[in-house]
């Protein structure tokens, strides 16, 4: 188990293709950018099966929302990280992620990479997926602690990843690296790949 943890930590420090991140399409569906009122309507987070990265997933295609229609209020201690975020400062510059939340559950998607989890501190309900496109298999326990989302690979004491709000921005610590992200309000249709994806899906505004 320790050797697997070391492997994951090495992956966190591996090379990053910022140009590929910057060129990849952002979510083209305007609904992805909305943050609806969490009024308790719809299914509960527990009634929706855990999602995962599908075979053949890539940065180029974003899957449908996992928690669509679930309006369960956020758990105590959970920051509201919902929306689409773009990293503008730090090692992961250009990276974009879509965050869905309901109850004690959070789904973080980058292109077709889906990390879906309940933040109850267990491996059983945490991430059971790949670390990244072409990455090693990982199992991660997740928690919300005093407004911070924390990820512990293999439920060890080491907190490998955190996300928290800082004003209107997100601070994302990925291994030893600190990144800042801004929340996007709508699809950036001036971005070539995003515009092409929207045109292909017929979601371009009139």
Predicted region positions:
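Amphipathic/hydrophobic helical signal segments and adjacent flexible N-terminal regions
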Residues: 2-112, 184-206
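Short, solvent-exposed coil/turn segments at beta-strand boundaries
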Residues: 81-84, 99-107, 119-127, 143-148, ...
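Contiguous, well-ordered beta-strand patches that form the walls/edges
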Residues: 90-91, 111-165
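Short, exposed beta-strand-loop hairpins at the edges of beta-sheets
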Residues: 170-176
């Amino acid at each position: 188990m320790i050797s697997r943890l070391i492997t994951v930590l090495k992956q966190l420090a591996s090379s990053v293709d910022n140009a590929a991140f910057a060129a990849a399409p952002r979510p083209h569906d305007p609904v992805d950018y909305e943050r609806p009122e969490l009024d308790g309507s719809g299914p509960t987070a527990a009634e929706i099966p855990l999602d995962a990265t599908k075979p053949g997933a890539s940065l180029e295609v974003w899957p449908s929302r996992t928690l669509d229609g679930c309006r369960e209020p956020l758990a105590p201690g959970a920051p509201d990280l919902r929306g689409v975020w773009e990293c503008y400062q730090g090692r992961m510059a250009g990276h974009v992620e879509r965050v869905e939340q309901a109850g004690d559950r959070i789904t973080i998607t980058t292109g077709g990479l889906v990390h879906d989890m309940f933040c109850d501190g267990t491996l059983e309900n945490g991430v059971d997926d790949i670390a990244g496109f072409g990455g090693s298999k990982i199992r991660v326990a997740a928690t919300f602690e005093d407004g911070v989302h924390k990820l512990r690979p293999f439920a060890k004491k080491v907190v490998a990843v955190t996300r928290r709000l800082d004003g209107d921005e997100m601070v994302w610590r990925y291994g030893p690296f600190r990144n800042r992200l801004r929340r996007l309000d709508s699809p950036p249709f001036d971005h070539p790949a995003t515009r092409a994806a929207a045109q292909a899906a017929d979601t371009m505004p009139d």
